[in-house]
Amino acid sequence: MSVDQDRRPVIEGVPELHWASLPMAADRGIGWKVLRDAGPVVLMDGWYYLTRRDDVLAALRHPELFSSKKAFDSLGSPLPLVPIAFDPPEHTRFRKILQPFFSPHTLKDMLPSLQQQAIDIVEAAAAKGECDAMADIAIPYPSQVFLTLFGLPLKDRDRLIAWKDAVIALSEHPTLEGVDTTPALELFTYLTEAINERRQDKGNDILSQVLTGEDALNDAEALGLGFLFVLAGLDTVTSAMGSALLELARNPQLRTTLREDPDQVAVFIEEIVRLEPPAPLVPRFTTQTVTIAGVTLPPDTPVRLPLAAINRDGSDDISTDDVVMDGKVHRHWGYGGGPHRCLGSHLARMELTLIVNEWLKRVPEFELAPGWIPEIPFPANTFGLETLPLRYRSNR
């Protein structure tokens, strides 16, 4: 997402940095500290970043002042990205419709299928003696979960991944001039056909359910939900999965702890999301004049809320740059906060927990490939590894 530099508000006295200059690739802890140390409000590439925890949480909790709808309207998406591109009361309606399908109780019914898929993917990788954990595990599994939730055939997985990659790359272009939009049109057609099929032949999948009932989604809303899942629900889980497996590869004692006490996997997963939220920035636009730390932001000011920065701000014993394994699940904002808190957080936890558990059962000891340096591509909107080469003894 970009902001037109010519129309950004110019506010005197605000320190300015450049996003691409932050030292994020090798160590996000250092990068976020540079941002926090610059001041409570920092201008970067047309966006005003709020860096203090209280200010970020206040913005998340007050959509009447910090609008998600305005932020996503600025993208010019032809589809309403349900529910994130709406503010209350419209957003409240969508959450009421969708929340039951992503509750722990509902997801529990899907656990056997999702667990078996995790086992199949992990066993295929474990048999090789080495793998790229991103390509072999972290990329395919979330895509299969999406297809399962929407009642779509798993054979479409590789097509879905290709469409997802192409559409995300497309969204990063400032204009569509000279850009191949074929993948976006193909994904649009694929989801449209799926919606039409569900209207004719209802199943037990989520897509079928949201298309029926007194307050069902219309076709455009269902398409927007599908697009949001593909654009925001796949790479985020992929990235968190990579971060989890990287940390385990670097920490033999942690592997032992989790194998001996699988209940601690839940603590570990929350720590990974706290430290390495894959979508670390939340965009908002002000709806009226707002004053933050003495800085007056006029209406329509583009604002970014750095979730990862406040999770590591040192304001308490657990808000550190290290994994805290004290047996407790600690509060954090890796999934956002306020009414727009991540709808799929329970699903993401389930996916991450399944992969970590099944991997440790089959590959108790593993290490990073010699000479490989764990850096993420930066600058980027989603933080995650491109590759993760692991070495271990084959269990074939």
Tell me the role of every PLM-derived stretch.
Residues M1-R396:
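Cytochrome P450
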